[in-house]
C-alpha cells in the first residue's frame, strides 16, 4: 500500500497529462506532493528525509517549468532525483564509510560485507543509468512518450532490477537449518 501511496503524485501527473497538458500535469504533481507530505505529517508527525527531498525537487523543477513555461525542467526532475540517489549511495560509502542499502535492509537480510558493498554499488549504478536513460527519452522522444516512460518504463525497469537483485541475493543468503 505504501508503494501506491508513494506513486500517488506520479499517477496524478500521468492522468493530468492525458486529460490536459504537461503544465497542468506539473501543477497537479506539485499539489499532490504537497498533499502527500501533509498527509504523512498529519498521520505520523514525521516525514522521511527523502520525501522532503522529493518535494524540494518537484517544487524547484516543477516551479521552473510553470514560471518559465518550459517543459525541459520537469523532464530533468527524475534525472536529478536518480543522480542524487546514486551520489548519496556512493558518497555515504566514500565519505562516511556507511553503506545506506545495508542500513536500510540489514534488519531483514543477513549478508556478507562484500555482498553489501556490491549491492550498494549496483543500486548506485542503476540510479545513475536511470538518470541517463530518462534524459535520452526526454530528448529523443515526444513529451507524451516521456510521460509514458516516466510511469511505465521506469517502474518496469525498477521492478526488473528488484527481481534480478532478489535472485542474485538469494545465492548469497545463509541457509536456515531446521533440525
Swiss-Prot record:
UniProt KW Cell membrane keyword: yes
Cellular component GO terms, alphabetical: plasma membrane
Annotated membrane topology: Multi-pass membrane protein
Listed NCBIfam families: ispZ, PRK00259.1-2, PRK00259.1-3
The keyword Membrane is annotated on this UniProt entry: yes
Subcellular locations according to the entry: Cell inner membrane
Pfam families: IspA
Superkingdom: Bacteria
Reported function: Plays a role in cell envelope biogenesis, maintenance of cell envelope integrity and membrane homeostasis.
Principal location: membrane
Family indicated by similarity: Belongs to the YciB family.
Name listed for the protein in its UniProt record: Inner membrane-spanning protein YciB
Keywords (A to Z) from UniProt: Cell inner membrane, Cell membrane, Membrane, Transmembrane, Transmembrane helix
Segments crossing the lipid bilayer: 3-23, 24-44, 49-69, 76-96, 121-141, 149-169
InterPro entries to which the protein is assigned, alphabetical: YciB
Gene encoding the protein: yciB
